[in-house]
């Protein structure tokens, strides 16, 4: 049997086949592992790779390209390198490292790549942001002018912090650095409850770098019990995580905080602590065969921290008026603030809160050294009433410290010196505060006003804490709120009478 095929039919058939033929090309640039060890893989063949690009190994482990050399690419591995062998294929992803950001992150605990580790499932609606971005320029910024209350009397009165500021918390191990940071997060609970709009709310990001997992779990428990997780994000790169993740975690947390800053909201980010990030970066740099410098840190360790902390800023009204406040933590060795990393970060930040072991063991907690602690821009953001009340506080404490050193040797002191010692001891007592008990600003104003104006001068030192509790529990709410307006002229009459009456009962 013969089949006759007409040319027109054949043409139509071929045309329809060609029209419906889709080819979906996917071009992958593939490299091969030349050597691997100590969390570093040398890869040959990735000629077009970008610095900081994410790559994927055949085993599924990811890494980031940091060294682009003539012969090969130095890649730091996010995870265990035991599953990577010489000759394995490595694929470019084409994307620079990014993390999820947005309000969906609030209340969650994530790792340095933004993957949830709290066992509460995947993240809901969110956007993705690059971890490394340029800091806002000069024109996009505005001077710091809004207060960021920590709830700690010693900080809010003597070293006030403003929204958009970078204030370093520095001290030896076990001096209460993390306690100040946590108290600041807890204090935002009452501040946010008073907020009338989204622009007044302050969201918190806590980045734990190189800490024990048990410590991070304890922190999560403290925040959840205080209902503070609802406005907080926790980024954890624990001690058991690879060095690249500890290096990356602060940038990831910063990208999450920048979401709020760039959308007209306010955020606070705590880096606890940047000493461990510098150590992780030193480890990576030495393994990548980069030349070491002072204390074996690489030459760009200053840039490591400056590019991170410059991203904390107060935005101008034209760019949304949002802010990102940074509280970096640095651990010193035996109180040496002149070491390499501490001096670097002190020079980058807008002030520092210095904590001392000696004060901590003497029971002065928070153990803030008032003489060394400073806030370079915060006073512009301090409440007017607080500024009036604590104007003489720093001077009196400085004079007290000076005289107290000599008073140990001589017993025959004149009346003025004895009065100064007496007042200084009481001011020091008033600035003490238990952990996880932040005070609203109006209560701080009342307590400091009482101490500065001599209501505690004739009172035994052990009665001062009781006096503080008494006045805070019995003062009328209207009178307390009126303190924010300042304590001058006629406004002083009612508080003075109230404080005097309470003081007389304890003398």
Swiss-Prot record:
Belongs to the ATPase alpha/beta chains family. InterPro entries: ATP_synth_asu-like_sf, ATP_synth_asu_C, ATP_synth_asu_C_sf, ATP_synth_F1_a_nt-bd_dom, ATP_synth_F1_asu, ATPase_a/bsu_AS, ATPase_F1/V1/A1_a/bsu_N, ATPase_F1/V1/A1_a/bsu_N_sf. It is found in: Mitochondrion; Mitochondrion inner membrane. SUPFAM superfamilies: C-terminal domain of alpha and beta subunits of F1 ATP synthase, N-terminal domain of alpha and beta subunits of F1 ATP synthase, P-loop containing nucleoside triphosphate hydrolases. One of its GO terms (molecular function) is proton-transporting ATP synthase activity, rotational mechanism. This is ATP synthase subunit alpha, mitochondrial. The lineage of its organism: Eukaryota, Viridiplantae, Streptophyta, Embryophyta, Tracheophyta. Keywords: ATP synthesis, ATP-binding, CF(1), Hydrogen ion transport, Ion transport, Membrane, Mitochondrion, Mitochondrion inner membrane, Nucleotide-binding, Transport. ATP binds at residues 171-178. The record marks 373 as: Required for activity.
